[in-house]
Regions:
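Catalytic cores of Mg2+-dependent Asp-rich isoprenoid enzymes
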Residues: 1-157, 162, 166-273
């Protein structure tokens, strides 16, 4: 299996939202985006799948060295091999990849967030920076597109958090800010137990509205001159916003299930965006 094939298998499963967003990209940019997302999956899987925090820290430290090698050395991992020509072709920054690892490391140090600014920092590191990297690969002529890309990444992460409340709770994690829970009178223990209530639905209504506001904020920053180049992000936004609407339509049943869109609907959204 070549490094590119490994990345394809890791990051872009047929039917995933990401799969539909890159369908229309030229091959060179598609390979680059897939390599970046495969890297994100590798480091995210360490946090999600390695139960011993000290082992996870060691693995993340190894990836820090692999990133450095991808920018000027002899990397060992197939994802780092795939990244090596990408970072040169698109003049990407090593610091951005290290920041993504910083974000993943936050999951090893904390399982709660006091307020939204704390959560925004986490989202910036694990997703906003991914948006910035993606913008460089997709291309832009107006620097304000970077603001769009960063905020869109945060919107994507907020959507993931909403979709995965129950799944994260079963891992002992609550990403919804503690002051949001306090505002709606919900104890952390109720989330961990998977208890639905009117207060929980009110909380989730608030969280979905905030995520939608981040999409609005991102899209307002995208200049017309860069809309075509940034189409992959717009496709992802259309799919993820539809997912938020579906979650709300289902009554915010995110504690015991994972809402998703059908492949046909994703394809239709991608085609019309």
């Amino acid at each position: 299996m070549t490094p590119d094939e490994y990345c394809q298998q890791k990051a872009a499963r047929s039917g995933s939202s990401f799969y539909y967003s890159f369908l229309f990209l030229p091959p060179r940019k598609r390979r680059a985006i897939i390599a970046v997302y495969a890297f994100c999956r590798e480091v995210d899987d360490i946090v999600d799948e390695v139960s011993d925090a000290s082992v996870a820290r060691t693995k993340l430290a190894w990836w820090r060295r692999e990133v450095a090698q991808a920018f000027g050395g002899a990397p060992q991992h197939p994802v780092a091999h795939a990244l090596q020509p990408v970072v040169a072709q698109f003049v990407l920054r090593e610091a951005d990849f290290q920041t993504i690892i910083d974000g993943m490391a936050m999951d090893l140090e904390q399982s709660r967030f006091l307020d939204f600014p704390a959560l925004e920092l986490y989202c910036h590191r694990v997703a906003g920076v991914v948006g910035l990297i993606s913008a460089e690969i997709l291309g832009y002529v107006d620097p304000s597109t970077r603001g769009y890309a960063r905020d869109l990444g945060i919107a994507f992460q907020l959507t993931n958090i909403i979709r995965d409340v129950g799944e994260d709770a079963r891992r002992g994690r609550i990403y919804l800010p503690q002051d949001d829970l306090d505002r709606f009178g919900i104890a952390s223990s109720a989330i961990l137990r998977g208890e639905y209530s009117d207060a929980f639905r009110a909380l989730m209504t608030f969280e979905v509205e905030r995520a939608q506001q981040w999409y609005d904020r991102a899209l307002a920053q995208l200049p017309d001159a860069d809309r075509r180049a940034q189409r992959a992000g717009l496709i992802m936004a259309a799919i993820y916003r539809a997912l938020l609407s579906e979650i709300a339509r289902d009554g915010f049943l995110v504690l015991d299930r994972r809402t998703s869109l059908t492949p046909l609907r994703k394809l239709w959204l991608a085609w019309k965006t």
